[in-house]
């Protein structure tokens, strides 16, 4: 079993914002593969599906971004997972828009949702996929809570699809194969 966490903020108000790109990747995976079961558990929506017979949990924390660890840790413990079985997808202002980067571990890059997860798990040693949203011309909060422009939308849709494919590769062949194929 593997757990995929897409970071975002709950509610319609935030559904199309840059900060919710992690949720969008989970939605793309749910579109590609049939969800067997969906439940609300530990401050998160959890979808269950299979890719090549591997059970995958799609987790959307219902806490706000900065408290994502509050939802992730109890699920991680409940399902008795190893750090290598967790993958987190999130936005990154330090990458150009539409860029997808896969890593086996790493820092938080100042991302509050990742900081919360790393603190709650007591480790940064788990796979992650960062999706570039670019640097803001103004304030960071307005940028991440803003929606993509019409010209950005096709680029971001390509990134969502690429990230979903990278996750499928991770499930089937591991993080090294995913990094080699999609970085």
Swiss-Prot record:
UniProt site (Stabilizes the basic form of H active site to accept a proton): 91
Family, per entry: Belongs to the PTH family.
Site feature: Discriminates between blocked and unblocked aminoacyl-tRNA: 9
HAMAP family: Pept_tRNA_hydro_bact (MF_00083)
Top-level class of the enzyme under EC nomenclature: hydrolase
InterPro entries reported for this sequence: Pept_tRNA_hydro, Pept_tRNA_hydro_CS, Pept_tRNA_hydro_sf
Residue ranges crossing the lipid bilayer per the database entry: none
EC number of the protein: 3.1.1.29
UniProt keyword list: Cytoplasm, Hydrolase, RNA-binding, tRNA-binding
NCBIfam families per record: pth
Broad class of the protein's primary localization: cytoplasm
Domain of life: Bacteria
Localization, UniProt: Cytoplasm
Species this chain originates from: Syntrophomonas wolfei subsp. wolfei (strain DSM 2245B / Goettingen)
Keyword RNA-binding in record: yes
Active site residues of this protein: 19 (proton acceptor)
Protein's name in the database: Peptidyl-tRNA hydrolase
